Amino acid sequence: MPEDNLYDISIIGGGPIGMFAATYAGMRSAKVQLLESLGQLGGQPQALFSEKTIYDIPGFSSISGKDLIRNLNTQLQQFNVDVYVNSPVLNIQKTEKNQFKIITNNRISYSKSIIISTGIGSFEPRRLRIANAEALENDKLFYTVNDPSIFENKTIAIAGGGDSAIDWALELNTIAKDTIVIHRRNQFRAMESNVDKLKESGSKIMTPYTIDNLSTDNSHNNLTIQLKKVRTKDTVELSVDALLVNYGFMSNNSILKSWDLDLITTKNNLIPVNSKLETNLQNVYAIGDIANYPGRIDLIAVGMGEAPMAVNNALESLYPEKIQPKHSTQLVKNIKNNENN
């Protein structure tokens, strides 16, 4: 086995939590690789919410998904981390040396420990289940927003009742001519403070309604949305320029089933971990939204705290004789001293 292909830590999943875990592992002078199945790092904030404003990142009153990932990438590049994108992990096997053989679609590597940070796994939006919806995608019907400017001075309908729907309604309300929020319940599931902002924003709120049909006129300029009021026969028609559907995302973590991990199958194959973020497999850790323990909540801020914990616990298990520096100042100073020697 070539030594340059053997890592102290392999991090599977290149979303924001995996990126910071790789950064911290590099800061600890570990030999580390970061494996990401998509063509770019960043996970959901980069692929799905690049223009969405995030308000619960420590140190930032607000930051867009793309800016968060850009900052994390700048931080990552300060340290010696091997990054592989377009590299979905197909299998993990235990070797006779009590190490891990990691097989991706394009290479084989070995690792002394693994940190899983796959989040919700591979994901795609929950789509409208009506006959002609697919034909309207990326024209009048959208599930993600890559460029908010296309909605400038337009009448936009946003369907959904969770955080994403309300966040986008507030965001687009600043540039759109009119915004209309459609939800099948009278109560929203989004953060209460944002729901209050929505009610004060001037957006039109249509509850409890479901989308029954979509159609366009001959010129294809306007989209007509037929709404049906829940538990009644009442219908309403809306004429808008575009519809943004935020019904959440379907995820797939089924690949984890082949890795001998204990999984909570009733919770989308989440991985139970202990207070050290250890899984049932020795030297395998889980962090971020894929990890499960009592009281955990799915916030980027929570995962950011788990990242250095998992790295430190992994290195302590591998190299118990090494003294762990307490502060990043000393860690970076040590790296610079080694580079100068």
UniProtKB/Swiss-Prot annotation:
Gene3D superfamilies xref list: FAD/NAD(P)-binding domain (3.50.50.60)
Entry-linked Pfam families: Pyr_redox_2
Cofactors named for this entry: FAD
InterPro entries according to UniProt: FAD/NAD-bd_sf (IPR036188), FAD/NAD-binding_dom (IPR023753), Fd--NADP_Rdtase_type_2 (IPR022890), Ferredoxin-NADP_redctase_2 (IPR050097)
Keyword list, A-Z: FAD, Flavoprotein, NADP, Oxidoreductase
Cofactor binding note: Binds 1 FAD per subunit.
GO molecular function, one term: NADP binding
EC numbers, comma separated: 1.18.1.2
The reaction(s) this protein catalyses: 2 reduced [2Fe-2S]-[ferredoxin] + NADP(+) + H(+) = 2 oxidized [2Fe-2S]-[ferredoxin] + NADPH
Residue pairs linked by disulfide bridges in the UniProt entry: none
Primary enzyme class: oxidoreductase
Residues noted as binding FAD in the record, renumbered to the chain: 36, 44, 49, 89, 123, 289, 329
UniProt-listed PANTHER family: THIOREDOXIN REDUCTASE 1-RELATED-RELATED
HAMAP family in the record: FENR2
Recorded family membership: Belongs to the ferredoxin--NADP reductase type 2 family.
Known partners and oligomeric status: Homodimer.
Protein name, UniProt field: Ferredoxin--NADP reductase
Taxonomic source organism: Ligilactobacillus salivarius (strain UCC118) (Lactobacillus salivarius)
